[in-house]
Swiss-Prot record:
One of its GO terms (molecular function) is flavin adenine dinucleotide binding. The fumarate reductase enzyme complex is required for fumarate respiration. FAD binds at residues 13-16, 42-44, 49-50, 420, 436-437. It is found in: Cell inner membrane. Belongs to the FAD-dependent oxidoreductase 2 family. FRD/SDH subfamily. The lineage of its organism: Bacteria, Pseudomonadati, Campylobacterota, Epsilonproteobacteria, Campylobacterales. Its EC number is 1.3.5.1. NCBIfam families: PRK08626.1 (NF006383). One of its GO terms (cellular component) is plasma membrane. It comes from the Bacteria. This is Fumarate reductase flavoprotein subunit.
Length: 714
């Protein structure tokens, strides 16, 4: 039996895995990266819109800093995130942007003077300062106070992935693709690597290491309609679950992106709306201002997705053979802007829908027939233009994943996890656009460093016989799938699983339908034990891969559905129509799913409390819908009083915002990442003789005063 030894084993070759591999090589470790596909084909490349980091370079970004990025991230998560992790993230993100620039990422840059833009559906002129010429530009994204999303046109993930992959090659990281991880090797609650199948030859071997880091991405493919690549089936997270030790966090927290192309499901980046694109119904009306007067199309993703579906349910969706949808109008931006800044969107729309989204020519006025006369709140009807893109919400991102602590350590010692595969828990119950590729790189930096330090100190304490036993177990299972007498067809089971998840565990959830989904998923899981593969070869066999992966996917589907059924509240992307309020009194916690015994047919669910008394910002009104639509935590007022007292005391002592923040909620982070981020406007504040950052203390004070006055509810 073949066994390969190394110091650091990284499973997954996207942004998080590759960046972590660089951290390992920088410490002199023998590092191997295993990837299902050539690493430049990883799903990280599909990210279009940008990466959030509070640089505050551009006109519309002035005044931005870590505090505002932190506040947006916490509010976006619907107070479901780990606030210490959010602080680690926002502090490191500006450093990550500049590191990527030094590695060759061609960030779109500021050009001094006037530039045209579309803001809130109106054509405006933005004047960039002469002294900011050449600095990194940022665009608007949903759920943010400032324009914070740095970008390279609409191919940000692609350029980032190529730069990080090149840097990994520069450091001579051993990257091996077409490798499929089947199971983790573990003994006495410690992980020592993985059993791996070569997709081309079918050979099953072991990679034994001092430390293992999982970075295999999300689990979107358990749904039928998703923007995710075919490799995003969550098999890595499921393998962690199958150890019986590692746990999955917040699996019911599934994001549905508002603007997926109909019918293909390919993402139409949030940059379309960030740059000024609008959503229209079948009558051509811009309907989002009626639902979200402040943020409109740039409300958080979970909010926009719900509003689109609510509007469609009212009968205002455009008809198509693939179901009702609404329109995304970016022709309003002008052809020059679309072809320069949204060229990938244009290519995708033309290739997969036959639509030139820059075409503002009138196609028909027939769509305006029957427009209600008594609904001025939805705006004016408009003739259908040729360039409008058909879109509707589809599964997009996995907030849940393998539960880790802030250092990336899972419940299984020696196993780390980073990126979308992890529940680090930066995103809570809703992720902000632009925080995903940002998290992938930042987690690769922070967790990669902690992982490398672990590998430097750890020892391999497992004998060859135990490793060979893991190899044999996987070999026997492959033989069973190829030669058992079962009659079940893998594709029939997989397709029905996806349909159940789409139909009953989607944007809107309800107890009875979740119970129905759970029952059917259990039946499918039982059937998956009797799958027999028709193609009998071990090598180059996609049917075999689907067979062993489908059983893992069903375990994840059960975790998602069980978590959604038990969580009797609505929080972020988890919307229960039978429990419409966010309930901080009962549900300010994190769901943990485990599978301690292979004989189980359902996950074990437990909960991890989020401690209000350790939060920098206590749970409050998120800013969408009715103000009273949440049940406050009983300790909220006590924590608010503590926060206010601390701010007032430190302000009297002349402390700046960073010192105030540290007093409110200390967090651990490597010194090189925790160092202060300097911005151009910092020097201007100093030049005026003002107290650096003091204006943010007042802003925070105003916020907490409002909380104490009861302005967080009606």
């Amino acid at each position: 039996m073949k066994i390969t030894y190394c110091d650091a084993l990284i499973i997954g070759g996207g942004l998080a895995g590759l960046r972590a591999s660089i951290a390992c090589k920088q410490k002199g470790l023998n590092t191997i990266v295993l990837s299902l596909v050539p690493v430049r084909r990883s799903h990280s490349a599909a990210a279009q819109g940008g990466m959030q980091a509070s640089l505050a370079n551009a006109k519309k970004s002035e005044g931005d800093n870590e505090d505002l990025h932190f506040l947006d991230t916490v509010k976006g998560s619907d107070w479901g995130c780990d606030q210490q992790v959010a602080r680690m993230f926002v502090t490191t993100a500006p450093k990550a942007i500049r590191e990527l620039a030094s590695w060759g990422v061609p960030w779109t840059r500021i050009k001094k003077g006037d530039r045209p833009a579309v803001v809130n559906g109106e054509h405006v002129t933005i004047t960039e300062r002469d002294d900011r010429h050449g600095y990194i530009l940022s665009r608007d994204f949903g759920g943010t106070k400032k324009w914070r999303t740095c970008f390279t046109a609409d191919a940000t993930g692609h350029t980032m992935l190529y730069a990080v992959a090149n840097e990994a090659l520069h450091h001579k990281v051993d990257i091996q693709d077409r490798k499929d991880m089947l199971a983790f090797i573990h003994h006495d609650n410690k992980c020592y690597g993985a059993v791996v199948r070569d997709l081309i030859t079918g050979e099953i071997s072991a990679y034994v290491s001092k430390g293992t880091l999982l970075a295999t991405g999300g689990y979107g493919r358990v749904y039928k309609h998703t923007t995710n690549a075919v490799i995003c089936d969550g098999a890595g997270a499921a393998s962690a679950l199958e150890t019986g030790v590692a746990k999955l966090g917040n699996m019911e927290a599934v994001q549905f992106h508002p603007t997926a192309l109909v019918p293909s499901g390919i993402l139409m980046t949030e940059g379309c709306r960030g740059d000024g694109g609008v959503l229209r119904d079948k009558f051509g009306r811009r309907f989002m201002p009626a639902y979200e007067p402040e943020k409109k199309e740039l409300a958080s993703r979970d909010v926009v997705s719900r509003r689109i579906l609510e509007h469609i349910q009212k009968g205002y969706g455009a008809k198509s053979p693939y179901g009702d949808h609404v329109w995304l109008d970016i022709a309003i931006l002008g052809r020059n802007h679309v072809e320069k800044n949204l060229r990938d969107v244009r290519d995708i729309a033309m290739t997969f829908a036959g639509i030139d989204p820059a075409d503002s020519k009138e196609q028909t006025k027939d769509n305006m027939q029957g427009v209600p006369a008594n609904e001025p709140e939805y705006g004016q009807a408009m003739a259908k233009q040729k360039g409008w893109i058909p879109i509707k919400p589809m599964q997009h991102y996995s907030m849940g994943g393998v539960r880790t602590n802030p250092k990336g350590e899972t419940h299984l010692k020696g196993l780390f996890c980073a990126g979308e595969a992890a529940c680090w828990d930066l995103h809570g119950f809703n992720r902000l656009g632009g925080n995903s590729v940002s998290e992938a790189v930042v987690a690769g930096m922070i967790i990669g460093d902690y992982f490398a330090s672990h590998c430097l100190e750890a020892q391999i304490e497992i004998n060859t016989q135990k490793v060979e036993a893991f190899i044999k177990e996987s070999q026997d299972y492959m033989h069973f799938l190829l030669h058992n007498e079962g009659k079940e067809d893998v594709y029939e089971i997989r397709e029905r699983m996806k349909e159940v998840m789409d139909e009953k565990v989607g944007v809107f959830r309800e107890g009875k339908r979740l119970e129905e989904a759970l029952k059917e998923l259990q039946e499918l899981y039982a059937r998956s034990k009797n799958i027999c593969v028709k193609n009998k070869v071990l090598h180059n066999n996609p049917e075999l891969e689907d067979a062993y992966r489908t059983k893992k996917m069903l375990k994840l589907a059960l975790c998602i559905t069980q978590g959604a059924l038990l969580r009797t509240e609505s929080r972020g992307a988890h919307t229960r129509i039978d429990y419409p309020k966010r309930d901080d009194e009962k549900w300010l916690n994190r769901t943990l799913a485990s599978w301690p015994s292979a004989e189980q047919d359902m996950p074990t669910i437990e909960y991890e409390e989020l401690d209000v008394m350790k939060m920098e910002i206590s749970p409050d009104f998120r800013g969408y819908g009715k103000k009273g639509n949440f049940i406050p935590h009983p300790k909220k007022e006590e924590r608010d009083a503590e926060i206010l007292k601390t701010i007032l005391e430190l302000e009297k002592l002349g402390k700046d915002r960073i010192e105030v923040q540290h007093a409110l909620m200390p967090f651990e982070l490597q010194e090189k990442y925790k160092a202060r981020n300097m911005r151009l406007e910092d020097e201007e504040v100093r030049a005026r003789g003002e107290h650096l950052y003091s204006f943010n203390v007042h802003e925070l004070l105003d916020q907490h005063n409002a909380n104490l006055k009861g302005e967080h509810h009606e």
